[in-house]
């Protein structure tokens, strides 16, 4: 990386963030800010460790920092964005394409997002555009499958009519807490759920492919479940889609019907979240899935 100095705020420098630690820390200095003094220098030695409130510390740091000319750096960032821009034009229904449609149709409007855990969570982080605080609800690396629907329900109760919550989940997570559609229906919460149905635990399958040479176990959900009928049994409107035009129409209808809970079930073929780096590798040393 190009950074001479890394200012880390509330970070524990876990291996998923740093990759190979010796390569990550080479030839750069760290300022580590955390409310908990025990986190400072635990995984990465800092040149300056500051324990306290982020807002107060950043104000003090800004007073000591001269204003620099970042024009050339912004040019470089935009060049990288163009070089590595995701190609959504694949001609079939994929999760990245669908989430790009969600982003395009909700940008600048009053929406919040809640995800479950798995591949869809990674794709949501990559392809949605979250631009306001407290509008992105995800359990990060904790791996709490089933989190998404209760989180969306609670957020919708908190936001009320001022903001609508879009919930992204996989078929695995819905099997864990899908019963909460009863509460959503009973309270009339206008949560929009998008269920990614790839008949498996996609993230587990991807990890078993990369780390265990495709020795798959306990990640296939091949017994077909009708998620539309399941959701409809609670009195919630649901639709099943398998093509781009079907998803676009379903999304348009669901966004227009803003007062009611709606569910879109996406049938998609198994694919991989990219880019991905193996544990212990440098964070730009990506797995080749071809």
Predicted regions and their residues:
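Active-site diphosphate/adenylate-binding microenvironment
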Residues: 77-158
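Active-site glycine- and acidic-residue-rich loops that bind
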Residues: 12, 91-96, 173-176, 244
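Thiamine diphosphate
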Residues: 2, 24, 40-51, 55-59, ...
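Active-site beta-loop-alpha junctions enriched in small/polar residues
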Residues: 12, 118, 269
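Structural signal for hydrophobic packing residues in well-ordered secondary-structure cores
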Residues: 4, 10-13, 58-66, 81-85, ...
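Structural beta-sheet core signal
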Residues: 8, 32, 115, 167, ...
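Glycine-rich, acidic loop regions that bind phosphate or pyrophosphate groups
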Residues: 1-76, 254, 265
């Amino acid at each position: 990386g190009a950074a001479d100095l890394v200012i880390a705020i509330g970070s524990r420098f876990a291996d998923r963030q740093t990759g190979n630690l010796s390569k990550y820390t080479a030839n750069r200095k760290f300022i580590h800010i955390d409310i908990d003094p025990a986190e400072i220098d635990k995984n990465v030695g800092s040149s300056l460790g500051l324990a306290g409130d982020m807002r107060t510390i950043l104000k003090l740091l800004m007073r000591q920092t001269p204003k620099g000319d970042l024009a050339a750096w912004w040019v470089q960032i935009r060049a990288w964005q163009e070089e590595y821009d995701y190609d959504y034009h694949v001609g079939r229904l994929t999760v990245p394409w669908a989430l790009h449609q969600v982003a395009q149709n909700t940008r600048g409007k009053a929406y919040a997002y809640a995800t479950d855990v798995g591949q869809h969570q990674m794709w949501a982080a990559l392809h949605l555009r979250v631009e306001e605080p407290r509008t992105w609800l995800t359990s990060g690396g904790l791996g709490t499958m089933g989190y998404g629907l209760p989180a969306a329900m609670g957020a919708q109760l908190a936001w009320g009519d001022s903001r609508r919550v879009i919930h992204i989940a996989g078929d695995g997570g819905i099997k864990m807490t899908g019963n909460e559609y009863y509460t959503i229906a009973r309270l009339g919460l206008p949560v929009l759920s998008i269920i990614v149905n790839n008949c498996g635990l996609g993230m587990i399958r991807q990890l078993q492919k990369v780390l265990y040479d495709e020795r798959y176990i306990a990640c296939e959900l091949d017994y077909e479940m009708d998620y539309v009928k399941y959701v409809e049994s609670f009195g919630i409107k649901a639709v099943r889609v398998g093509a781009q035009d079907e998803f676009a129409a379903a999304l348009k209808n669901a966004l227009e019907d803003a007062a009611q809970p709606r569910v879109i079930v996406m049938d998609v073929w198994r694919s991989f979240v990219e880019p991905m780096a193996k544990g212990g590798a440098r964070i730009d040393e990506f797995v080749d899935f071809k």
